[in-house]
UniProtKB/Swiss-Prot annotation:
SMART domains, A to Z: MADS (SM00432)
Source domain of life: Eukaryota
Keywords for the protein's UniProt record, in alphabetical order: DNA-binding, Nucleus, Transcription, Transcription regulation
GO cellular component, one term: nucleus
Organism expressing this protein natively: Oryza sativa subsp. japonica
Protein name (Swiss-Prot/TrEMBL): MADS-box transcription factor 13
Cysteines paired by S-S bonds: none
Pfam families to which the protein is assigned, alphabetical: K-box, SRF-TF
GO molecular function: DNA-binding transcription factor activity, RNA polymerase II-specific; protein dimerization activity; RNA polymerase II cis-regulatory region sequence-specific DNA binding
The protein's role, per its UniProt record: Probable transcription factor.
């Protein structure tokens, strides 16, 4: 069911009238506040109860200034509309400028108080409020600092685990490479041993071929005995030949075998 219409007339019951006054007064103050905030309007509300108690509201916390503005506007309203608008605009901007200057001054004082300046003129209550604000600020700062430190510690722990894993991988690779190098070294040693065993076996089977190969490596004698025999035969053939120059001179030169001593050759005859 919908709410029934209430007849607008004086409430005879004193208690009911007082309760209704409180409710309607609070609603009126709320509406005045909403009007000033939503519409950026200057609102002043003055209420007297049946017992003569004063209730007032002003969005700039100065009902008297609003009343003075009203008086000036009412005084200028009889002349023309344009001057009234100009006066109202000028008063509005002056009030707004004063508000802004006051807010700036308050903020500057607050900033100075936060760093410990100009606290000599503060009362005990204001000092307690300032102390409470500073403690709350320090608590928030410490909480944020601890949060950042915890995050940094977690990151460093993860980084440590990653570095340990990388170190393990590197050690594994180094061990594998050392094992491969050891295998190659063992294989080379085995191959050299096999070559030495094969050379020893070949020397036992054919010692003259091995000796000839060793002499050839040192460049002392020809490669094999067949070449040596051929050189001896060539020297013998030269001995059997007579050089014409030696015959004309009346002597013949004894050809020396390569490698023979110089003392074995006969002296020449003149």
């Amino acid at each position: 069911m919908g709410r029934g219409r209430i007849e607008i007339k004086r409430i005879e019951n004193t208690t009911s009238r007082q309760v209704t006054f409180c409710k309607r007064r609070n609603g009126l103050l709320k509406k005045a506040y909403e009007l000033s905030v939503l519409c950026d309007a200057e609102v002043a509300l003055i209420v007297f109860s049946s017992r003569g108690r004063l209730y007032e509201y002003s969005n700039n916390n100065n009902v008297k200034a609003t009343i003075d503005r009203y008086k000036k506007a009412h005084a200028c309203g009889s002349t023309s509309g344009a001057p009234l608008i100009e006066v109202n605009a000028q008063q509005y901007y002056q009030q707004e400028s004063a508000k802004l200057r006051h807010q700036i001054q308050m903020l500057q004082n607050t900033n100075k108080h936060l760093v410990g300046d100009n606290v000599s003129n503060l009362s005990l209550k204001e000092l307690k409020q300032l102390e409470s604000r500073l403690e709350k600020g320090i608590s928030k700062i410490r909480a944020r600092k601890n949060e950042l430190l915890a995050s940094e510690i977690n990151y460093m722990a993860k980084r440590e685990i990653e570095l340990q894993n990388d170190n393990m991988d590197l050690r594994t690779k180094i061990a594998e490479e050392e094992q491969q190098l050891q295998q190659v070294t063992v294989a080379r040693s085995a191959a050299m041993e096999l070559q030495a065993a094969a050379a020893a076996q070949q020397q036992q089977q054919n010692p003259f071929a091995v000796a000839a190969a060793q002499l050839d490596m040192k460049c002392f004698f020809p490669l094999n005995l067949f070449e040596a025999a051929a050189q001896v035969q060539a020297v013998a053939a030269q001995r059997q030949q007579i050089i014409p120059t030696e015959l004309n001179l009346g002597y013949h030169h004894h050809l020396a075998i390569p490698g023979a001593a110089a003392a074995d050759a006969p002296p020449p005859h003149f």
